[in-house]
Amino acid sequence: MDQNPNMIDYKKLVDGYLGLADWRVKENSTVTYSIGGLILSNSGAVTANYWLSHVYDKEIADAHRRADIHLHDLSMLTGYCAGWSLKQLIQEGLGGVPGKITSSPASHLSTLCNQMVNFIGIMQNEWAGAQAFSSFDTYLAPFVKADGLSYKEVKQCIQSFVYGLNTPSRWGTQAPFSNITLDWTVPEDLKDMPIIVGGKKIEGITYGDCQREMDMINKAFIEVMLEGDANGRGFQYPIPTYSITKNFDWSETENNKLLFEMTAKYGTPYFSNYINSDMEPSDVRSMCCRLRLDLRELRKKSGGYFGSGESTGSVGVVTINMPRIAYLAIDEQDFYTRLDKMMDIAARSLKIKRNFITQLLDEGLYPYTKRYLGNFDNHFSTIGLVGMNEACINAKWIDKDLTHEKAQKFTKDVLNHMRERLSDYQELYGDLYNLEATPAESTSYRFAKHDRERYMNIISANDYGDPYYTNSSHLPVDFTDDIFAALDVQDGLQTLYTSGTVFHAYLGERLSDWRQAAHLVRKIAENYSLPYYTLSPTYSVCKEDGYLEGECGLCPYCGGPTEVYSRITGYYRPVQNWNDGKAQEFKDRTEYKVDNDAIGYSQEEPVEAVESVLKLIVTKTCPKCKEAEKLLTEANIEYEKVYAEDNPEFVRKLGVKIAPTLIEKAYVEPDADDDYFYYTGINGVHRYVNYNKKGNGNDE
């Protein structure tokens, strides 16, 4: 008897996961190989089969199975991403769902931090993608003011928030995918509004009166993110987005030093460009309130690359395989005919999904979403694309990649055509549609893998190794090491998307200091119109010696294995967790070099070495540095403490790459060059202390 095609081979499914034989095991790099991952894999296969067999019609299901399009998040019977009103949580508390406990509005910062962690964790189980809060620092500041909290108390609260969000509490042994936007300075639309604490407005105190407390929140958050975990590993969540406005203060404030040191070292923040883009800082709070008077108007999704503005988001994402359309098209007219057909299928699938999950919402399947959101009216239906660079190469009438003007012009025409089509769908279906530069963590690999098997002569991003397509309309990953040459091209393309577009400045290793990072961030904001961008240095982590600059397969100090971290389609994960296609992309990348003259940055004169015999190189936020200081002090060993942040040239001159590092000046002949002994990491300091307790002198 023939097997029903909708039946799942459970043995193949489980064995494929356990033996890592199925590429989907690494489809999402945030999911750890674990029993939770196995459960998610099994349930995901069942749910995906349900979508394709019982919800979508045959035309939609076949288009996905053939890899003409990719229906994202088939493994979950939920919407895609959502932004939530932190103001609403502060006013109403956490709860209000029948049969579940309810917490009153928070009266203290510690309580609010706990409620935010629980809220995001709950919502992450009702959605497939990122959960976001806007104006994090603005809304939290009044709680600091109301209780007169010390900086130590504020930092403790923020620390519990960050650690709570990074606990793998979500299905699949994942941490909740979370994003926050930080205003840095009090937004104009909130300045004169009375603060809310304990669910009540407090007359006589406005958000504009809380800038000092905002600074405390921002300092605490950045210090926690800079410190990383006990092994020096950067925190994955929340992904912070900072607003760069025309009145951004670029002076050498304490918080600026911390912000751009975090950027230089870990590449953690996203930056929203409010200087030259057509966005406004208040968009994250006002999008849900706008009247839809013109059905053809395409709105931009606010709230950051992954995040969403208050009470907005996306019900689902469908990505179109652009290289295949170009490869099969006879000419340009045929290309647009094929593209329109795929867009029609994508738009219809999103309408079906919206109707289906709206029915489930009304039936109570997402109780907390129903309580805090109510409906999906302000959530987009999202259509994205992958491989426009390879589409241009495969198109017989272009036959060039995106580094050529002919291909760039064609790409702009295609994106504008897609925008017009989205306006048609808004009129037809009455829903919001947007055009996204899809992150495509697994989709770029899936499309290329299918196409290489099916079409012998189709061109992917690489001629060797595992195939992949370039994300959205990005340039070839090995195009140039000149960041501004890449920006010049991308600026004209990325501004045509209405969501999910970002420029990643991939850097081989951390920038030299916070000033260099600040100069580069400012140069981009003031000279380009693209809405979001990041600086993305590669770094490694050794469990013994902590943070290491750049890509280090083995620790240069202890010889042990490391985790190499880079940004995969928007967030940092160990490269060994990436799927084969993205891992190949990482190998192929040409990283950008930063020309200091181009960004108007000049390094300060080298700091001369002082004459003390023993120096301890530390950073201001590293817990292992404090441990090293304690070891030396308790052993009655005299030393001079040198902050790496304040003496970057001196530290670079001595070749120090890890904090803490203990440097001992060796005895040499009077006219000889200085020589030094290095004791690297906390283990090196331990060795020095233990050896010198015995009075034996140097051990290296």
Show the residue positions of the predicted features.
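Hydrophobic/aromatic-rich, well-ordered segments within soluble, folded domains that form packed cores
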Residues: 178, 182, 376-398, 555-579, ...
